[in-house]
Amino acid sequence: MQKLFTQAKAFSRRILKALENYGRKGLGVLTLCSLLASSPVFAGIPLKQGDGAVNDAQVNAAIEVYNRIPASIRLQYELNHNSITFFNSKQRRDNVIGMYTALDGMEANIMLSDQDLLGAYALAHEIGHYFDDVVYKDEEILLQEKRYGNQVFRYVTRGKRSRSEEADFVAIYQQEANQNGLVTQYEKSDSTEYFAGSFKAYVDTPEQLQVVAPSTYAFIDQLVTEFNASHPVPEEAVTA
């Protein structure tokens, strides 16, 4: 297990070195297709030891999901020194399998349940919350905090912190959520959860998402395209 956690840190070190060598200015923009085709390079995952009882199967499942996320989003998550941990599900009674906490994508932590593989498979949903957060500047938010074990979870009681709370995506949510069978009933509960669930579908089954919820797919795809352009991945990091 310790070997897996050690290997999980390799991606950050390689990316940071590439940025030191080349800087961000003038780096070519790589297409999403080419980034995903090169995903074996991103073998690591920014795991931090939590209080969960994690086994190799859970870590490997999380790594497999993580490597399906667009590379520009993974890169930014790691460059901001954000982390992923597993929490002890036996100490909780609310059946939560994943949580995301951050401020504009900074000081972020994704917390996953150590119950079977449920937490690992929820990773794309939680990264969806991160992406929704990092592309949007918080507006007049009021935060409260809860502590889960040794982790602090921040949640908003007022204001906006996500792109999916804007009127254009709320309209898409109201139009397509009920017909989108790729998301759960919980993910249909509001526009932010719908964005996270649809981002997971965008990562897992993009062709199906494009069929059942075309406006949702187009919205997320446009955000990813714009993020790729504004956060290019160093070519050395992709081909190393």
Describe each model-derived feature in a short phrase.
Residues 77-240:
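Active-site-flanking segments in enzyme catalytic domains
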